[in-house]
C-alpha cells in the first residue's frame, strides 16, 4: 500500500511549503538533499555486490540492462547512454529500458508502468540471456513493469538486482541483490523525482563507473577509453595522454594520431617506446588494462 511507503509520507519540516519564501524553499531542498549521500552510504556493501556481479557479466561478454518507469527509467537510460562516449563501450553493453518505450522518455505513457508483460517483451527483444545482469529501478519499490522484468530475467538465468528508496521493497523479492536507499519523505509529498531520484542517480553512477574500472576502462583516474566524437573529446584525449605519460602536448598529439586516436594505445606507445601494433598486442594480452600492459 502506498501509505506505508516512506517516500509517500508528508515531510514534517515542509508542511507550510506554499507559504515559504523562494529562499526558504531552496534552503529546505538543499537541507534535505544533504541527507541523500548519507543514505546511499548505508548501502555501499550491497552496491559493491552489484558491481561485482556486473563485472562478471562484462567479463563473460554479457550486458548490463536497466529497467524502470518514469524518472527511474529515464535515469537508467541516462546512465546507459553516457557509457559509450565515456568508456568506449558499444551501445549494446549497457542498455536502458523505460515503461512505454523511448517515447516515454519525454512524455509520460499512461498505464505503461502497470503492465508487467511490457518489460518481458522489452527484454525478449534483445535476447536476454544468463550472461546478462538486469537492474530494476523503482523509487517506490513496487512498480509492476520492473517486477515483470525481474521475473523474466530470473526465468532465463540472468543476474538480477534492484534499486529502491524504501526498506523491504516489493521489487526486492524478485532480485537476487537489493539496494534499498531509504531517502524518506520528500519536501513535496510523493515527488520522488527529488531525493529518491538523486539517490538513484548516485547509485547508478557508482555501479557503471566502478564496473568499468573493473574491466580496464580506466588507467589511474583517467578515462582512457574515451571516444573522440567531438572537438572537446579530441582535446581531452590528448590531455589524458599528457597526464598519463608526462610528455609534452605536441608529443601526445603526435602519438594520438599514430595510434589512430586510440588513447590507450598511445599511452602504451609512449611509455614503452613501441609501435602501434605492439601496443595493441600488449593491450590485448592485458585484456585492456593499461597498467597490466605496461
Curated annotation (Swiss-Prot):
It comes from Bacillus cereus (strain AH187). It catalyses: N-acetyl-D-muramate 6-phosphate + H2O = N-acetyl-D-glucosamine 6-phosphate + (R)-lactate. Specifically catalyzes the cleavage of the D-lactyl ether substituent of MurNAc 6-phosphate, producing GlcNAc 6-phosphate and D-lactate. Belongs to the GCKR-like family. MurNAc-6-P etherase subfamily. Pathway: Amino-sugar metabolism; N-acetylmuramate degradation. GO terms for biological process: amino sugar catabolic process; N-acetylmuramic acid catabolic process; peptidoglycan turnover. A lyase-type mechanism (elimination/hydration) is suggested for the cleavage of the lactyl ether bond of MurNAc 6-phosphate, with the formation of an alpha,beta-unsaturated aldehyde intermediate with (E)-stereochemistry, followed by the syn addition of water to give product. This is N-acetylmuramic acid 6-phosphate etherase. Keywords: Carbohydrate metabolism, Lyase. Residues 54-217 form the SIS domain. SUPFAM superfamilies: SIS domain. Homodimer. It comes from the Bacteria. Disulfide bonds: none annotated. The active site is at residues 82, 113. Its EC number is 4.2.1.126. Gene3D superfamilies: 1.10.8.1080, Glucose-6-phosphate isomerase like protein, domain 1. GO terms for molecular function: carbohydrate derivative binding; carbon-oxygen lyase activity; ether hydrolase activity. InterPro entries: Etherase_MurQ, Glucokinase_regulatory_CS, MURQ/GCKR, SIS_dom, SIS_dom_sf.
Amino acid at each position: 500500500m502506498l501509505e506505508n511507503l516512506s517516500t509517500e509520507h508528508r515531510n514534517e519540516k515542509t508542511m507550510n511549503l506554499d507559504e515559504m519564501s523562494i529562499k526558504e524553499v531552496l534552503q529546505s531542498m538543499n537541507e534535505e538533499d544533504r541527507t541523500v549521500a548519507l543514505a546511499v552510504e548505508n548501502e555501499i556493501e550491497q552496491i559493491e555486490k552489484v558491481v561485482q556481479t556486473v563485472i562478471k557479466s562484462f567479463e563473460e561478454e554479457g550486458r548490463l540492462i536497466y529497467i524502470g518507469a518514469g524518472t527511474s527509467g529515464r535515469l537508467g537510460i541516462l546512465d546507459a547512454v553516457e557509457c559509450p562516449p565515456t568508456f568506449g563501450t558499444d551501445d549494446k553493453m549497457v542498455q536502458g529500458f523505460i515503461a512505454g518505450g523511448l517515447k516515454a522518455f519525454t512524455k509520460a505513457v499512461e498505464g505503461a508502468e502497470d503492465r508487467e508483460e511490457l518489460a518481458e517483451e522489452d527484454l525478449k527483444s534483445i535476447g536476454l540471456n544468463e550472461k546478462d545482469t538486469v537492474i530494476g529501478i523503482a523509487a517506490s519499490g513496487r512498480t509492476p513493469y520492473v517486477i515483470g522484468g525481474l521475473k523474466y530475467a530470473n526465468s532465463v538465468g540472468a543476474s538480477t538486482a534492484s534499486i529502491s528508496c524504501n526498506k523491504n521493497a516489493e521489487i526486492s523479492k524478485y532480485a537476487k541483490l537489493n539496494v534499498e536507499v531509504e531517502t524518506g519523505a520528500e519536501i513535496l509529498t510523493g515527488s520522488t523525482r527529488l531525493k529518491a531520484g538523486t539517490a538513484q542517480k548516485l547509485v547508478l553512477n557508482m555501479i557503471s563507473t566502478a564496473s568499468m574500472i573493473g574491466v580496464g576502462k580506466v588507467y589511474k583516474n583517467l578515462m582512457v577509453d574515451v571516444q573522440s566524437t567531438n572537438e572537446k573529446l579530441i582535446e581531452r584525449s590528448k590531455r589524458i595522454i599528457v597526464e598519463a605519460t608526462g610528455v609534452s602536448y605536441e608529443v601526445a598529439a603526435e602519438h594520438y594520431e599514430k595510434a589512430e586516436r586510440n588513447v590507450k594505445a598511445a599511452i602504451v606507445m609512449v611509455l614503452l617506446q613501441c609501435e602501434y601494433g605492439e601496443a595493441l598486442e600488449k593491450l590485448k594480452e592485458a585484456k585492456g588494462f593499461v597498467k597490466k600492459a605496461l
